[in-house]
Amino acid sequence: SLVNVEVDLRRGIPAVDVVGLADGAVKETRERVRSAVINSGFEFPSERVLISLSPADLKKEGAGFDLPVALGILNAKEDSGFIEENVLVMGELELSGRVRAVKGIHAACSTAFDSGIQYAVVPEANFDEACSVHGRKIVGVESLEEAASALKDVTCFGKAFEIKEESSESISFSDEVDENVDGLELPKRLIRAIEIAVAGKHNLLITG
Protein backbone atom coordinates (compact mmCIF):
# COMPACT_ATOMS: atom_id res chain seq x y z
CA SER A 1 0.00 0.00 0.00
CA LEU A 2 1.09 3.57 -0.66
CA VAL A 3 1.89 5.82 2.29
CA ASN A 4 1.02 9.51 2.16
CA VAL A 5 3.61 11.77 3.82
CA GLU A 6 2.34 15.10 5.19
CA VAL A 7 4.36 17.73 7.02
CA ASP A 8 3.02 20.59 9.11
CA LEU A 9 5.00 23.38 10.78
CA ARG A 10 3.57 24.68 14.05
CA ARG A 11 4.50 27.17 16.70
CA GLY A 12 6.11 25.69 19.76
CA ILE A 13 9.35 24.30 21.13
CA PRO A 14 11.43 23.09 18.14
CA ALA A 15 11.03 19.33 17.77
CA VAL A 16 10.07 16.70 15.21
CA ASP A 17 7.08 14.47 15.91
CA VAL A 18 6.15 11.42 13.81
CA VAL A 19 2.63 9.96 13.90
CA GLY A 20 1.13 7.09 11.95
CA LEU A 21 2.21 3.74 13.43
CA ALA A 22 5.91 4.09 12.60
CA ASP A 23 8.45 1.47 13.67
CA GLY A 24 11.85 2.20 15.23
CA ALA A 25 13.64 2.71 11.91
CA VAL A 26 11.06 5.25 10.77
CA LYS A 27 11.22 7.14 14.07
CA GLU A 28 14.99 7.40 13.62
CA THR A 29 14.21 9.26 10.40
CA ARG A 30 13.88 12.44 12.47
CA GLU A 31 17.56 12.65 13.32
CA ARG A 32 18.83 11.51 9.92
CA VAL A 33 16.62 13.99 8.10
CA ARG A 34 17.61 16.90 10.33
CA SER A 35 21.31 16.32 9.66
CA ALA A 36 20.77 15.61 5.95
CA VAL A 37 18.78 18.82 5.44
CA ILE A 38 21.36 20.99 7.19
CA ASN A 39 24.38 19.29 5.59
CA SER A 40 22.77 19.72 2.16
CA GLY A 41 22.78 23.48 2.59
CA PHE A 42 19.11 23.93 3.46
CA GLU A 43 17.72 25.62 6.55
CA PHE A 44 15.90 23.31 8.93
CA PRO A 45 12.63 24.83 10.22
CA SER A 46 12.78 26.49 13.62
CA GLU A 47 9.12 25.59 14.19
CA ARG A 48 7.77 22.36 15.66
CA VAL A 49 7.55 19.82 12.83
CA LEU A 50 4.71 17.29 12.67
CA ILE A 51 5.14 14.39 10.22
CA SER A 52 2.02 12.36 9.48
CA LEU A 53 2.24 8.99 7.72
CA SER A 54 -1.14 7.76 6.53
CA PRO A 55 -3.12 5.54 6.52
CA ALA A 56 -2.63 5.55 10.27
CA ASP A 57 -3.56 1.88 10.75
CA LEU A 58 -0.82 0.62 8.41
CA LYS A 59 2.51 -0.17 10.06
CA LYS A 60 5.38 1.77 8.47
CA GLU A 61 8.75 0.04 8.28
CA GLY A 62 12.23 0.76 6.93
CA ALA A 63 14.36 3.79 6.17
CA GLY A 64 12.80 4.49 2.77
CA PHE A 65 10.78 7.34 4.25
CA ASP A 66 13.87 9.53 4.83
CA LEU A 67 13.82 11.21 1.43
CA PRO A 68 10.05 11.89 1.23
CA VAL A 69 10.05 13.27 4.77
CA ALA A 70 13.00 15.58 4.02
CA LEU A 71 11.36 16.83 0.83
CA GLY A 72 8.08 17.26 2.70
CA ILE A 73 9.82 19.47 5.25
CA LEU A 74 11.39 21.57 2.50
CA ASN A 75 8.03 21.80 0.74
CA ALA A 76 6.29 22.91 3.94
CA LYS A 77 8.36 26.07 3.92
CA GLU A 78 7.05 28.90 1.79
CA ASP A 79 8.17 29.29 -1.84
CA SER A 80 9.61 25.79 -2.21
CA GLY A 81 8.87 25.92 -5.93
CA PHE A 82 8.07 22.19 -6.06
CA ILE A 83 5.77 20.90 -8.79
CA GLU A 84 2.14 20.60 -7.73
CA GLU A 85 1.80 16.92 -8.53
CA ASN A 86 1.55 13.71 -6.56
CA VAL A 87 5.01 12.15 -6.69
CA LEU A 88 6.26 8.77 -5.50
CA VAL A 89 9.44 9.31 -3.47
CA MET A 90 11.60 6.62 -1.87
CA GLY A 91 15.13 6.70 -0.49
CA GLU A 92 17.27 6.44 2.63
CA LEU A 93 19.40 9.45 3.55
CA GLU A 94 22.92 9.51 4.88
CA LEU A 95 23.76 12.30 7.32
CA SER A 96 25.62 14.00 4.49
CA GLY A 97 22.45 14.18 2.41
CA ARG A 98 23.42 11.44 -0.02
CA VAL A 99 20.65 9.02 -1.02
CA ARG A 100 21.03 5.29 -0.44
CA ALA A 101 19.23 2.48 -2.24
CA VAL A 102 16.14 0.89 -0.69
CA LYS A 103 14.22 -2.33 -1.21
CA GLY A 104 10.84 -2.69 -2.89
CA ILE A 105 11.22 -0.04 -5.61
CA HIS A 106 9.61 -2.14 -8.36
CA ALA A 107 6.55 -3.00 -6.28
CA ALA A 108 6.17 0.58 -5.06
CA CYS A 109 6.40 2.01 -8.58
CA SER A 110 3.89 -0.51 -9.90
CA THR A 111 1.40 0.35 -7.16
CA ALA A 112 1.92 4.09 -7.53
CA PHE A 113 1.62 4.15 -11.31
CA ASP A 114 -1.47 1.92 -11.23
CA SER A 115 -3.07 4.44 -8.86
CA GLY A 116 -2.49 7.29 -11.31
CA ILE A 117 0.73 8.83 -10.01
CA GLN A 118 2.80 10.06 -12.96
CA TYR A 119 6.18 10.86 -11.39
CA ALA A 120 8.71 9.03 -9.22
CA VAL A 121 11.91 10.10 -7.46
CA VAL A 122 14.10 7.13 -6.58
CA PRO A 123 17.72 6.53 -5.54
CA GLU A 124 20.09 6.48 -8.52
CA ALA A 125 21.11 2.96 -7.50
CA ASN A 126 17.47 1.84 -7.95
CA PHE A 127 16.87 3.71 -11.21
CA ASP A 128 17.11 0.72 -13.55
CA GLU A 129 14.78 -1.29 -11.31
CA ALA A 130 12.24 1.53 -11.31
CA CYS A 131 12.45 1.87 -15.10
CA SER A 132 11.37 -1.75 -15.50
CA VAL A 133 7.90 -0.42 -14.66
CA HIS A 134 7.18 1.32 -17.95
CA GLY A 135 4.93 4.19 -18.93
CA ARG A 136 5.70 6.92 -16.39
CA LYS A 137 8.37 9.53 -15.69
CA ILE A 138 11.19 8.67 -13.29
CA VAL A 139 14.30 10.44 -12.05
CA GLY A 140 17.18 8.85 -10.16
CA VAL A 141 18.95 11.04 -7.59
CA GLU A 142 22.15 10.71 -5.59
CA SER A 143 21.49 13.44 -3.02
CA LEU A 144 18.77 15.41 -1.28
CA GLU A 145 19.87 18.49 -3.19
CA GLU A 146 19.35 16.69 -6.52
CA ALA A 147 15.92 15.49 -5.41
CA ALA A 148 14.85 19.00 -4.43
CA SER A 149 16.05 20.36 -7.77
CA ALA A 150 14.16 17.65 -9.65
CA LEU A 151 10.89 18.57 -7.96
CA LYS A 152 11.28 22.12 -9.23
CA ASP A 153 11.67 21.14 -12.88
CA VAL A 154 9.37 18.55 -14.41
CA THR A 155 11.70 18.19 -17.40
CA CYS A 156 14.18 16.38 -15.13
CA PHE A 157 11.92 13.35 -15.19
CA GLY A 158 12.79 10.93 -17.97
CA LYS A 159 10.31 8.54 -19.54
CA ALA A 160 10.78 5.02 -18.27
CA PHE A 161 11.93 2.48 -20.80
CA GLU A 162 9.14 0.71 -22.62
CA ILE A 163 9.29 -3.01 -21.95
CA LYS A 164 8.12 -5.18 -24.83
CA GLU A 165 5.75 -7.82 -23.55
CA GLU A 166 6.25 -11.15 -25.26
CA SER A 167 3.24 -13.26 -26.12
CA SER A 168 3.11 -16.54 -24.20
CA GLU A 169 2.51 -18.25 -27.56
CA SER A 170 6.05 -17.32 -28.68
CA ILE A 171 7.68 -19.01 -25.69
CA SER A 172 8.78 -22.61 -26.04
CA PHE A 173 10.52 -25.03 -23.72
CA SER A 174 12.99 -27.76 -24.55
CA ASP A 175 12.55 -31.23 -23.08
CA GLU A 176 16.27 -31.92 -23.45
CA VAL A 177 18.47 -31.74 -20.37
CA ASP A 178 21.86 -30.18 -21.08
CA GLU A 179 23.46 -31.08 -17.78
CA ASN A 180 22.69 -33.25 -14.79
CA VAL A 181 22.78 -30.95 -11.77
CA ASP A 182 23.81 -33.86 -9.58
CA GLY A 183 27.25 -33.61 -11.15
CA LEU A 184 27.63 -29.91 -10.45
CA GLU A 185 29.29 -28.56 -7.32
CA LEU A 186 26.55 -26.11 -6.37
CA PRO A 187 25.02 -25.06 -3.05
CA LYS A 188 22.05 -27.21 -2.12
CA ARG A 189 19.74 -24.19 -2.01
CA LEU A 190 20.73 -23.24 -5.56
CA ILE A 191 20.10 -26.78 -6.81
CA ARG A 192 16.71 -26.67 -5.11
CA ALA A 193 15.93 -23.34 -6.80
CA ILE A 194 16.87 -24.81 -10.20
CA GLU A 195 14.63 -27.83 -9.60
CA ILE A 196 11.69 -25.61 -8.69
CA ALA A 197 12.26 -23.36 -11.71
CA VAL A 198 12.43 -26.34 -14.08
CA ALA A 199 9.37 -28.02 -12.57
CA GLY A 200 7.28 -24.86 -12.84
CA LYS A 201 8.85 -23.61 -16.09
CA HIS A 202 9.87 -20.37 -14.36
CA ASN A 203 12.61 -17.96 -15.41
CA LEU A 204 15.75 -18.12 -13.27
CA LEU A 205 18.69 -15.70 -13.29
CA ILE A 206 21.94 -16.86 -11.69
CA THR A 207 24.85 -14.45 -11.30
CA GLY A 208 28.30 -14.79 -9.81
Give, region by region, the residue ranges found by the protein language model.
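Peripheral, non-AAA+ core regions of ATP-driven protein-machinery
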Residues: S1-T207
